[in-house]
Amino acid sequence: GLQAQVICLSEHPDLPQQDLLGVPVSIQLATDEGVLYPINGVITDIQSGQSDGTLTSYRLTVGDAMSLMRGRRNMRTFVGKSVPEILETMLGEWQQRSAAMDRVFDFELLLDRGRYPKRAQTLQLDESDYGFLDRMTRHDGIWCFVKAGTRDGSASNAPVHTLVFCDDPMRLPQSAAGTVPYHYGAAVKERDSITRWSEARSLIPGAIRGTSPDH
């Protein structure tokens, strides 16, 4: 997924923060070849910072459509649907929630549908939509990444991003970046490179126990 924090400067110390939440944005990064590489997302959080009387700083948190799905919890049962069909159903529902959401993101399923039989029942048990999709796709060896633009590359008036779900790296096209070298240290190189590789861990629940929702 995508989660980035961007520090912006503005001449306006009283920007209407509520009007910026949910707005699609595009961050342009210059590559070593002088080409602009876009990162598209949605403003999910905004915080005003210090001001020197002329410029005011704002810290924006930019995420993808999946991060917005953390806010809705649901309990539902999918009957006779495969994993790709459940993905299409839930992502399609989010696109239809509002015209704004439809303009914000698209999705693409690069999946071998023959691997996913229809399930008798699939239960979303008081989970966020994000948590449910994350659990289901991890179980089946599906990963998700974000790419800028629409699924078919068509033009759009807003900075759209596409959620790509894939189960086989051989289905992906060759990256325009090619092979990215790794260089240890802070020395300036002629090409963009990876400069740090580190291990990270986080604490998660080992088990969840819930009482019956049937009162």
PLM feature segments, named:
Residues 1-215:
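Amphipathic alpha-helical and helix-coil boundary elements used as assembly
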